[in-house]
Curated annotation (Swiss-Prot):
Monomer or homodimer. Interacts with CAV1; the interaction forms a stable heterooligomeric complex that is required for targeting to lipid rafts and for caveolae formation. Tyrosine phosphorylated forms do not form heterooligomers with the Tyr-19-phosphorylated form existing as a monomer or dimer, and the Tyr-27-form as a monomer only. Interacts (tyrosine phosphorylated form) with the SH2 domain-containing proteins, RASA1, NCK1 and SRC. Interacts (tyrosine phosphorylated form) with INSR, the interaction (Tyr-27-phosphorylated form) is increased on insulin stimulation. It is a peripheral membrane protein. This is Caveolin-2. The lineage of its organism: Eukaryota, Metazoa, Chordata, Craniata, Vertebrata. Its main location: nucleus. The modification Phosphotyrosine is found at Y19, Y27. The modification Phosphoserine is found at S20, S23, S36.
Length: 162
């Protein structure tokens, strides 16, 4: 119990060669990915998901568990994270990809065939609507506002302090 003086040898056998004992998976450089296979996150959308054991469980300097407990909990954390991710992707990846594909196809279709023609039609009609609106404001609203303004301009207030 206490501060570790020896370096513990922990080995986890996984099919990923990029496993790190420090913080979960180590992400290789893009050049290394290009040679070894397909880069599944080329735009680094999920770079914030580099979550390791030390990010979740941490013991302060004043209180440490037994070294073997710390090593076993670290190994169990990494194994359970790896296995649960694989298990969840087996059951959720295909249905969620299917739903996302339907959603994006629907949104693309609506944007291409409904929204953009509507916007273009509005932009074509707007110059004539603008001309009609300018005529209505010049004929009806401008004289009304002018007469109300003249009526209120003749009102004067005098304050007296008695």
């Amino acid at each position: 119990m206490g501060l570790e003086t020896e370096k513990a040898d922990v080995q986890l056998f996984m099919d990923d060669d990029s496993y790190s004992h420090h913080s979960g998976l180590e992400y290789a450089d893009p050049e290394k990915f290009a040679d070894s296979g397909q880069d599944r996150d080329p735009h680094r959308l999920n770079s914030h998901l580099k979550l390791g054991f030390e990010d979740v469980i941490a013991e302060p300097v004043t209180t440490h568990s037994f070294d073997k407990v710390w090593i076993c909990s670290h190994a169990l954390f990494e194994i359970s994270k790896y296995v649960m991710y694989k298990f969840l992707t087996v059951f959720l990846a295909i249905p969620l990809a299917f739903i996302a594909g339907i959603l994006f196809a629907t949104l693309s279709c609506l944007h291409i065939w409904i929204l953009m023609p509507f916007v273009k039609t509005c932009l074509m009609v707007l110059p004539s609507v603008q001309t009609i609106w300018k005529s209505v404001t010049d004929v009806i609203i401008a004289p009304l506002c002018t007469s109300v303004g003249r009526s209120f301009s003749s009102v004067s207030l005098q304050l007296s302090q008695d």
